[in-house]
């Protein structure tokens, strides 16, 4: 069943509680959490991500990153051969040897992540014990942690969640009694700098970003820390921070003008910023972003869009496209729907929209074909087959790689959806 949204009425609190959400469990089409290395290795500039996996794992990360291995990026793969999988060698000895060689060759590494994969988990290689053992050997010069990037029952953005959650225990305890703001989730450096300037202009002091650009500059956390989520796919990280005493601020996510304004306002209210000052600081940016967005309304307004579950960005994106660009939501599916973290977003979605958590890919493909939307947001594995059927697609992974948060990027985000439609129109003409 599909729902064709014709209005833009939003959900009240009571309707939010009673909103029907379809839950599906079946065959899925997603990348694994190893994909998160592609943006994390660029973000944490003195870290290295060592995947303990197969040649397939190595090809995935290298291809997704678009980096040739001889360029010495900050990631690599300790490839498990057949003899390792068969138990003919001691995998721990081999891992110790690889790590020793790596750290000798790359003295700039201050933080090493051992990243588990499907093969390493199949043979029950205990990377947590390996990380502890190697940390004792190489500390204090190098901190060694581990997390799982396995694709078993996960989606690709969960790699960042697992990575950051493993880093939370390393954060120093907060000693300052003044309240601090911790922005959680990887942001492009240009976006991070924009937000830092905005917080400074608002008078919100003591702001840190997690993950940091350098592992030697980890932010502190404690009971006076307020968390502002920049990405919706970090439940384990937020839970770990809350266990350290931090408190999450309820806010929409900073996509588009409305989302960015609500996100900034949540921080401003928590830090007692005067509403008049908030208006003074944000109004010029809002106006500029709204003008830039208006150029895309003629192309996107009234177009019907269908979301396959892939990145966990689906609900904030749907809110942005529906409310700011007048697109009609046929179905919005997401791999996992954290109702508490997405509560502010769900309030802003049209009441009639069909929401789906999880995926049965065959059933969802059937619904998509029946609906014949103008554009489909999906993973790479589904994009080419749908394009062959004449359905315009947008790769969901591109929405994670591209800077899309904040006022300055609102029009860039809109263009990501307009571009495939323009391309299709030119091909048909």
UniProtKB/Swiss-Prot annotation:
Superkingdom assignment: Bacteria
Residues recorded as binding [4Fe-4S] cluster, renumbered to this chain, are 32, 57, 118
Cross-referenced Gene3D superfamilies = Nitrogenase molybdenum iron protein domain
Q: Which family does it belong to?
A: Belongs to the BchN/ChlN family.
> Which protein are we looking at?
Light-independent protochlorophyllide reductase subunit N
Sorted UniProt keywords: 4Fe-4S, ATP-binding, Bacteriochlorophyll biosynthesis, Chlorophyll biosynthesis, Iron, Iron-sulfur, Metal-binding, Nucleotide-binding, Oxidoreductase, Photosynthesis
Q: How is the cofactor bound?
A: Binds 1 [4Fe-4S] cluster per heterodimer. The cluster is bound at the heterodimer interface by residues from both subunits.
What's this protein's function? Component of the dark-operative protochlorophyllide reductase (DPOR) that uses Mg-ATP and reduced ferredoxin to reduce ring D of protochlorophyllide (Pchlide) to form chlorophyllide a (Chlide). This reaction is light-independent. The NB-protein (BchN-BchB) is the catalytic component of the complex.
Known EC number(s)?
1.3.7.7
Q: What pathway does the annotation place this protein in?
A: Porphyrin-containing compound metabolism; bacteriochlorophyll biosynthesis (light-independent)
Stored CDD domains: Pchlide_reductase_N
Keyword Iron in the entry? The reply is: yes
Question: How does it associate, per the subunit comment?
Answer: Protochlorophyllide reductase is composed of three subunits; BchL, BchN and BchB. Forms a heterotetramer of two BchB and two BchN subunits.
- Which cofactor does the UniProt annotation name? [4Fe-4S] cluster
Per its UniProt record, what Pfam families does this chain match?
Oxidored_nitro
Q: Which GO terms describe its molecular function?
A: 4 iron, 4 sulfur cluster binding; ATP binding; metal ion binding; oxidoreductase activity, acting on iron-sulfur proteins as donors; oxidoreductase activity, acting on the CH-CH group of donors, iron-sulfur protein as acceptor
Catalyzed reaction equations: chlorophyllide a + oxidized 2[4Fe-4S]-[ferredoxin] + 2 ADP + 2 phosphate = protochlorophyllide a + reduced 2[4Fe-4S]-[ferredoxin] + 2 ATP + 2 H2O
The UniProt record lists the keyword Iron-sulfur = yes
GO BP terms in the entry: light-independent bacteriochlorophyll biosynthetic process; photosynthesis, dark reaction
């Amino acid at each position: 069943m599909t729902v064709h949204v014709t209005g833009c009425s939003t959900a009240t609190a009571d309707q939010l509680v009673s909103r029907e959400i379809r839950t599906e469990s079946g065959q899925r089409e997603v990348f694994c959490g190893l994909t998160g290395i592609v943006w994390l290795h660029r973000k944490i500039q003195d870290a290295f991500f060592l995947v303990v996996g197969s040649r397939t794992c190595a090809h995935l990360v290298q291809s997704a990153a678009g980096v040739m291995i001889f360029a010495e990026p900050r990631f690599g793969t300790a490839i498990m051969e057949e003899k390792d999988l068969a138990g003919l060698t001691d995998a721990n000895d081999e891992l110790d040897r690889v790590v020793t060689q790596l750290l000798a060759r790359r003295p700039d590494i201050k933080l090493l992540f051992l990243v588990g994969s499907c093969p390493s988990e199949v043979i029950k290689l205990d990377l947590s014990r390996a990380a502890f053992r190697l940390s004792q050997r190489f500390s204090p010069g190098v901190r060694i942690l581990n997390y799982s990037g396995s694709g078993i029952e996960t989606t690709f953005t969960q790699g960042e969640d697992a990575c950051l959650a493993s880093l939370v225990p390393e954060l120093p305890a907060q000693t300052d009694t003044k309240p601090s703001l911790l922005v959680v989730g990887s942001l492009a450096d240009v976006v991070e700098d924009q937000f830092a300037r905005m917080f400074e202009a608002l008078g919100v002091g003591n702001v840190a970003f997690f993950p940091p650009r350098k592992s030697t500059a980890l932010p502190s956390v404690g009971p006076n820390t307020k968390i502002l989520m920049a990405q919706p796919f970090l439940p384990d990280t937020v839970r770990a921070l809350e266990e350290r005493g931090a408190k999450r601020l309820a806010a929409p996510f900073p996509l588009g003008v409305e989302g960015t304004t609500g996100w900034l306002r949540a921080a401003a209210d928590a830090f007692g910023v005067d509403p008049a000052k908030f208006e003074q600081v944000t109004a010029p940016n809002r106006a500029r972003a709204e003008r830039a967005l208006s150029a895309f309304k003629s192309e996107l307004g009234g177009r019907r869009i269908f979301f396959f579950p892939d990145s966990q960005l689906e609900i904030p994106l749907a809110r942005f496209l529906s409310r700011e660009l007048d697109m009609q939501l046929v179905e919005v599916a997401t791999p996992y729907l954290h109702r508490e973290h997405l509560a502010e977003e769900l309030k802003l979605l049209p009441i009639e929209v069909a929401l789906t958590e999880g995926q049965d890919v065959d059933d969802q493909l059937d619904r998509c074909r029946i609906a014949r939307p103008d554009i489909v947001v999906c993973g790479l594995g589904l994009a080419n087959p749908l394009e062959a059927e004449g359905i315009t697609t947008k790769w969901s992974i591109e929405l994670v790689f591209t800077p899309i948060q904040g006022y300055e990027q609102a029009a860039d985000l809109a263009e990501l959806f307009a571009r495939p439609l323009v391309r299709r129109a030119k091909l048909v003409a």
